[in-house]
Amino acid sequence: MSPVEIRDLERKAFQAWPALETRANFGWVQRFAGGYTKRANSINAIEAGAHFTPAVMAELERPYRERGHPPIWRLSPLAPAEADAVLAGRGYRRIDQSLVQRAPLDERFSPDPVVRIAASPGPEWLAGFAGLSPVAPHHRETMAQMLRSIAAPVGFASVEEGGEALAFALGVVDGDHVGLFDVLVAPAARRRGLARRLTQSIGAWGRDHGACFAYLQVVATNIAALPLYADLGFETVYSYAYRVP
């Protein structure tokens, strides 16, 4: 995937999971969301050839330290080639190697009658989603604020059985792509194909809203999800990792 294509997909993902505040400096985007998720509280290159000097590093990290948060660097292929080694030399740990995957929305993506997709997150959806996610109680309002601030067409998907919510996921359309985020299944309901049904339904929903491709971000060690995504035609187009103090 070319740098231009990577930048476009990065932009789509940023808008699909919006931070509460963003700043663009020196070819990097600083994202802030009160410490809720690394994705929304990280420093990200948005241009090939982004500046990376000691002075630039200090300036990019400063607002995080002032807020009492660790400066988290998210290194995609757009980051300067030396960034990973420089941060490692400063003692920053490399964590959560992740894959960005994409698939054409072909016949493998079809709506499932058990999957409900709403245009806005109601209180029950938010409570159920938060209950299955690792979000800390003090971050739940931030999470809700971020979800409500998504400007693109969004589908809040869920599966219920006997009045009990068993699974959730999020789909966000931007042009010809739909992003799939945070597929969560209750422990007691796993290994029943609910993640597949959510993924297929969100893909079909995205296609109905003009998308031709689905994309997602998945941790490279997620051995439960990777075979499912491969079966649905997802292929890795690039990867990224975090460096944290």
Please report, for each region that a protein language model flagged, where it lies by residue.
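Short amphipathic alpha-helix that is part of the acyltransferase structural core
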Residues: 1-10, 39, 44, 98-99, ...
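N-terminal charged segments
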Residues: 1-66, 79-80, 138-139
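A short helix-loop-beta-strand connector motif used in the catalytic cores of GNAT acetyltransferases and
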Residues: 15-21, 69-70, 83, 95-98, ...
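Conserved beta-strand in the GNAT
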Residues: 26-33, 93-95, 100, 158, ...
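Acyl-donor-binding surface of acyltransferase catalytic domains
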Residues: 49-124, 137, 243
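Conserved acetyl-CoA-binding loop-helix of GNAT-fold acetyltransferases
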Residues: 53-61, 182-187, 191-204, 208, ...
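Conserved GNAT acetyl-CoA-binding A-motif
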Residues: 67-76, 206-217
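Conserved active-site alpha-helix within GNAT-family acetyltransferase domains
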Residues: 80-94, 196, 220-239
